[in-house]
Regions:
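N-terminal hydrophobic/helix-forming segments and targeting peptides
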Residues: 1-454
Length: 454
């Protein structure tokens, strides 16, 4: 009863759908790390009149504010007409995606090649990440405080790197292995070069790679100890399908919900309640650490907002959180016509049918789930129906088939109402994921409606 084809809704407004997705394609094509997402989000926010919190002495209704954390989180606010202590309307997405990270001592030479040791980040099917073009993104931090940005493999004139695989002719033993073991995690090593530094006798190929890095970035091998270099798929997001109805790209999980959340608040006016969009890191590995959703960053930021309103109270900070309502902006598993047996089809998400609401996620008995209350689900339904938003409800696959989690339960621990709401994705956690353009646009509209009317 909730599955409505959303293309029909926009059949006379296709230009709006496609134009919005051009902006999204540009965003994910240039922002393949959490640091890049934050940097670009600041730029977009400032163009819309948002200012850093430290530039305000006091805050009033209508003020547009942003706060960042270690270059990996950003929280944006439009101060509402009602007192902040009456709660916020929050959109929360994550901007980290599955990938591989260079180890702290990554470089070595073997059989005439220079390679870089990696440790994969998040849940991946390791065999999907070999024999494809890869890029290197990140920062190298030197002892003197200098931070060097590194991007190799994205400019059309750049070289790319990659991970090799065994030729089919010699794969008899490999093909007998289970899929989880076909490519071992310790063998996800990136090939960086094959040419020696002429005149060098020991590790000459490695020496040549280090020479090139020194020339371009002025970095030494020891600097990798204090570096964060991420290995990600190369290339831009592309239209997918002969009808151009979908977007193929890296990092839809969860940058598609990050972008729609970001643009929803940037395109919103002042509402009754304070609007908020927060983009966090580390969701793919448990939302841990100083930049994950478990961090006190968000709570501290709310306390600082209240302080600039003349309220210095731990109790009021906690009550503000408790009185808030949130959409955990995260993707859902779309039904794949080639793998329909993993879904309960009447409780599944379909590409082209609008935003997806997951009352609960988790796995095997709802373990680790937020499980939104029926009362809150009804409130969200009313907001969506009043705004003529196409939405669907889903679970993450059949019972006991697997499962997954989001940041919903973390904010729910503050006693606020939270429900997962996002976009159906195919190929989730693969180097190339797929979303429907009309779902992207409808989710943007849904997020705006939530900020305005929830």
């Amino acid at each position: 009863m909730y599955a409505k084809n959303t293309w029909e809704k926009y059949k006379d407004q296709l230009n709006e759908v496609f134009d919005y997705n051009e902006g999204y394609k540009h965003y994910i094509s240039k922002n393949k790390t959490e640091r890049a997402c934050v940097k670009d989000s600041i730029k977009l926010a400032e163009e819309k009149g948002f200012k850093p919190l430290e530039s305000f002495d006091t805050l009033k209704s209508g003020d547009k504010v942003y706060v960042t954390n270690r270059g990996k989180n950003i929280a944006l606010f439009i101060i509402g007409k009602k007192p902040l202590t009456e709660g916020m309307r929050i959109l929360g997405a994550h901007i980290d995606s599955p990938r591989m990270d260079l180890k702290q001592n990554p470089l070595y030479e073997s059989e005439g090649f220079t390679l870089a040791d990696t440790h994969y980040y998040g849940g991946i099917k390791k065999y999907q990440w070999v024999t494809i073009p890869l890029s290197l993104y990140g920062v190298v931090c030197k002892k003197d405080g200098t931070v060097v940005d590194v991007v190799i493999g994205e400019d059309e004139n750049d070289p790319v790197v990659g991970i090799s695989d065994l030729l089919i002719h010699l794969s008899a033993d490999q093909l007998d292995k289970k899929a989880a073991k076909v490519i071992e995690g310790e063998n996800l090593d990136v090939t960086l070069g094959n040419m020696p530094l002429f005149g060098e006798e020991k590790d000459a190929v490695k020496a040549n790679v280090l020479k090139l890095l020194k020339e371009k970035y002025d970095i030494e091998e020891e600097n990798f100890v204090s570096a964060e270099i991420e290995v990600v798929p190369s290339g831009k997001a592309r239209d997918y399908g002969l009808d151009r109805s979908m977007v193929a790209g890296y990092g839809h999980d969860d940058r598609v919900c990050a972008y729609t959340s970001l643009t929803a608040i940037l395109d919103s006016d002042v509402s009754e309640y304070t609007s908020c969009a927060i983009l966090v890191d580390k969701e793919e590995i448990g939302s841990v650490g100083a930049t994950g959703a478990h961090s006190l960053f968000f709570e501290n930021t709310v306390a600082e907002l209240l302080l600039k309103m003349g309220i210095d109270s731990f109790v009021q900070t906690r009550l503000t959180m408790s009185r808030s309502k949130m959409l955990s902006s995260d993707v859902s598993a779309g039904v794949d016509p080639l793998f329909v047996n993993v879904n309960d089809k009447k409780n599944a998400a379909y590409l082209g049918n609008g935003i997806v609401f997951n009352k609960y996620t988790g796995s095997r008995g709802k373990s680790g789930s937020n499980d939104a209350s029926a009362e809150y689900v009804a409130q969200v339904r009313a907001v969506m129906d009043n705004a003529n938003i196409h939405y669907q409800t889903a679970e993450l696959g059949r019972v006991d088939q697997g499962g997954g989690g989001t940041i919903a339960y973390i904010l729910g621990n503050y006693n606020m109402d939270v429900i997962d709401a996002g976009i159906a994705v195919l190929n989730m956690h693969a180097p190339m994921e797929i979303v429907s353009k009309v779902d992207v646009y409808e989710t943007y509209q849904a997020y705006k409606a939530f900020l305005k009317d929830a």
